[in-house]
Amino acid sequence: MLHNYDDFGGGKMQGAPQVPRNTLLSVDQQLQLMNTINNMVRASQFTSQLANTIFTLCAQLKTSGSMLEQSHKNELNKVFTSLRQACCRDNGQLGTPCRLKIMELVELRAMNWRTNLAHSQYYVNRPEGQHDPAPTVGIPPSATSPPTQVTSSVTSPVPSSPQPPMQFVPQNPMMFQDPMAANHNAGGIFFIPAASTWMNPLMPMPPNPFLPHSMIPPDHQMFLRQRSLNKKPNNLMNKTLQLRHEMIIRNSDSGKIMGVKGRRVAAVEQLTNTVISFQKVDSKSKERTLTITASTMEDIERAKDMIIDTIRRNMSPMRTDMSIPPPNQYSGMSSENQSIPSQQNTANIDEDDDDDDEDIKLEQTSDGKLTFHCDDPELLAAAQEALSAYLRVRARPSAEEREKKKERRKSMPLQQTARDQQEPVMLKPAKTFHGSTPNLADGLAATTTVVVASIPQPMVPNVHASGDNPIRYNRDTLMTARDTKRAPIPDEMLQEINRVAPDILIA
């Protein structure tokens, strides 16, 4: 009888009578077997009924496993989880044949329920599978019934030849070869020990009793050893030779070669076909070791040069495929020009491309930025460095300019060369600094405008202009000069004043 166990109480419930394992069960009956296994494993009831159910389920899933995989995948996952838990929780009660069935079931599902000849022969040729793998022992109706009421409730497949029954104690538990073990006859016959059995085992069963290696035929062992020795040279020859080189950089330059989220070092690895690894060092360390791995020494040298160049420029490595393509100058050609032979067109295009590659265009945007346009990245970088060097030299004043600036800083009165000559004065709004952030003053100064005020120069007598006495102004002279209409100033003088006035006002 098939005994089902509830989830909590663990009590027995009489079910439908069992059928032979070779008979295909319905889907509901197979699901009932799965639930029985789940409940018994959850209740830690590793009895003969659990072994019988596992063997029956294995025989059914060999035929209908692929169908249940599509329709009842969750139930299959649950029962396989229970089988794994049963192998971990039991203390040897399941035995080797039951574990073999579980392993066969797991491998069969891993192969998408498609068995092959090697898989079938392995489990057929196992010594544990040559006899009845699950001799079923019925559970007595009560715990006090005599052992003579033990009956078999499930019929096993008919073996090809009569075999000795399965024994709980192995013939050779210490895995020693004993020639007299074949003539030894077992005493008690039972497969899985229950809580109250009529025979106690002679010794505890090992947790995982696999077959010893000595039971493999000697000729088969020699064949396997020769085959493994023959495979070793082939594996060594198939491996590609990898070269490794170490270079030392400053720890402060690690960020330059690493880039944001490792993009720069990834670009170097992609361009040079190498693998670059960084040594893990302390943040206070001054040096750091880079390990470059590649198949050829040329790739390692190119990677080293690219790393040094990336650190020096503090820019990502340049890709050749990212260069700007030259503009097509022949898009507007007429039909007459398009009839020229292809060889002449190719030659002209190559010449024009060479000329365009050497051409650099410098543009100034509305916000005052300078923009370079060139097709050659190297030429563009050289032009950028040349312009930067020129601006640095240009911004540095010479010795003569520094002397002139010192002279202009002195507060000396302006000499009047002509009687009616008048000069404008540049009035610039004063900068006010707020707190400790002078950048705010720069922003305010950027929004202000320069005010040019015209202040007429005072009219002084000729005696002061020609004499050696210094020029002095009183209140009456200044008031008279304010009301006097001044004469227009020539353009040349205005340009000169505008050129000199900023240096004087800044000083």
Curated annotation (Swiss-Prot):
Per its UniProt record, what InterPro entries does this chain match? KH_dom (IPR004087), KH_dom_type_1 (IPR004088), KH_dom_type_1_sf (IPR036612), Mxt (IPR040160)
What terms describe the molecular function in GO for this protein?
eukaryotic initiation factor 4E binding; RNA binding; translation initiation factor activity
Name the keywords, alphabetized.
Cytoplasm, RNA-binding, Translation regulation
Task: Provide ranges: composition bias, Acidic residues.
Answer: 349-360
Q: List the disulfide bonds.
A: none
Instruction: Extract the SUPFAM superfamilies matched here.
Output: Eukaryotic type KH-domain (KH-domain type I)
Give the span(s) annotated as Disordered. Answer: 126-163, 314-360, 395-424
Tell me which SMART domains the record gives: KH
Extent of Low complexity compositional bias: 140-158
Which residue windows does the record flag with biased composition (Polar residues)?
A: 329-348
GO BP term, pick one: regulation of formation of translation initiation ternary complex
| Subcellular location as annotated | Cytoplasm
Q: Where is the KH domain?
A: 242-307
Q: Fetch the Pfam families from UniProt.
A: KH_1
Gene Ontology cellular-component terms for this entry are: cytoplasm; RNA cap binding complex; translation initiation complex
Q: Where are its TM segments located?
A: none
Any notes on this protein's domains?
A: Binds to ife-3 using a bipartite interface in the C-terminal domain which comprises a canonical helix which engages the ife-3 dorsal surface and a non-canonical helix which engages the ife-3 lateral surface.
Subunit architecture: Interacts with eukaryotic translation initiation factor ife-3.
Q: What does this protein do?
A: Plays a role in promoting translation.
Protein's recorded name = Eukaryotic translation initiation factor 4E-binding protein Mextli homolog
Q: Which organism is it from?
A: Caenorhabditis elegans
